[in-house]
A protein has these predicted regions:
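A glycine- and small-aliphatic-rich helix-loop capping segment at beta-alpha/alpha-beta transitions
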Residues: 96-105, 181, 186, 314-316
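Phosphate-binding site of ATP-dependent enzymes
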Residues: 177-264, 285-292
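Conserved metal-phosphate-binding beta-hairpin within the catalytic cores
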Residues: 203, 213-214, 270-302, 312
Length: 341
């Protein structure tokens, strides 16, 4: 399932195409399902799947594709391989709908997906679990509108500069800004409020940004971690997913003991957040040796160039093999559930 309503729908299309291309056809009969901008589902032919953008696909849905009412989805598929990203795709909304329909799906469940999308709630859980996280101040829109000067003073005193400003519930570095002085706070916060009613201001970490995939259900295992090398101070969506943008080094250029520490922290975060199937944990190897957890990505990009496939290859898995394991984890989770679903 690909497309959707979020700012990441073009990446979702790339993920869906790649999953469709790389899935093991000896075991599975893939059905490309596209979610349009009104959240309607369509079974699309390959010629539409290969279009350049979601807009190009939507132009010919009525003539070329077959609508799939949600209530009949279970008659068409045995498991949904989620290629959706961002709001309404990886925030628990689609997961909840699939639970109601009784259809197995890849990735984490409703609550874990919702928590993973909310950076502040996620960070609080990780902190309570004893993990290192960046110092963070949450700013609700209502407080910003009535106490702007107090908020700016609190940022200067508790966080300092440079700092990072971001929407609380958006993925892939949407509207994330590095602010180097007090003069830049207002513009960055106002911009972030275009995306969410809750904005986070956090400390700007120094060291090496790393990311580590984790797969599994009851016994999760960490893949080989990667060093992420941004084209700017903050990783963009293009850095994370698209061809020729940004750079990853797998494995990360760190001592073996530091690599193992990163893998251990990734699994610990995966467990603390009750993630399932697969996820990518973004972290920072601080200059003092500590590993700070930034956030999880509960439905990592599955584009051909995504870092998750680099890590799988370094761990001895092909793209087809990783996709197969992710689907099997989905079936395992579904089989372990109790009740009518």
């Amino acid at each position: 399932m690909m497309g959707g309503l979020s700012s990441e729908k073009e990446v979702s299309l790339e993920s869906g195409r790649n999953i469709f291309s790389k899935i093991d056809r000896r075991k599975y009969d893939p059905v490309p399902i596209f979610m349009d901008s009104r959240a309607a589902l369509w079974e699309i032919p390959v010629k539409l799947l290969m279009r350049n953008s979601t807009r190009d696909i939507e132009e010919d849905l009525e003539e070329e594709a077959k609508p799939i009412p949600y209530e009949t989805l279970k008659e068409r598929v045995d498991v949904v391989c989620l290629g959706l990203h961002g709001k309404y795709g990886e925030d628990g909304c689609m997961q909840g709908l699939l639970e109601l329909l009784g259809i197995p799906y890849t990735g984490s469940g409703v609550l874990a997906s919702a928590i993973g999308m909310d950076k502040y709630v996620c960070r609080r859980i990780l902190e309570i679990s004893g993990m290192d996280v960046p110092r963070t101040i949450p700013i609700p829109r209502s407080r910003w509108e009535t106490e702007k000067s107090c908020v700016k003073q609190e940022v200067a005193q508790r966080i300092g500069f440079p700092c990072v400003v971001k929407p609380c519930r958006e993925g892939c570095s949407t509207a994330v800004k590095k602010v180097v002085s007090a003069e830049g706070i207002s513009d960055a916060v106002e911009n972030a409020f275009h995306w969410d009613n809750l904005v986070l201001v956090e400390e700007f970490l120094t060291g090496m940004e790393v990311t580590c995939g984790v797969i599994g259900v009851d016994a999760p295992e960490a893949l080989v971690p990667s060093e992420t090398i941004p084209t700017d101070d903050v990783l963009s969506l293009q850095d994370k997913f698209l061809y020729g943008q940004g750079e990853n080094k797998t494995p990360a250029r760190l001592p073996a003991e530091q690599i193992e520490k990163i893998r251990e922290n990734a699994v610990k975060a995966f467990r603390a957040l009750n993630l399932k199937g697969y996820a990518r944990i973004d972290m920072f190897a601080r200059n003092d040796g500590r590993i700070a957890i930034l956030e999880p990505n509960t439905l990592p990009g599955m584009t051909p160039s995504t870092v998750l496939f680099h890590q799988a290859a370094a761990s001895g898995m092909t793209q087809t093999g990783l996709i197969d394991r992710i689907i099997q984890f989905a079936l395992e989770v579904h089989a372990g559930k109790r009740g009518p679903l």
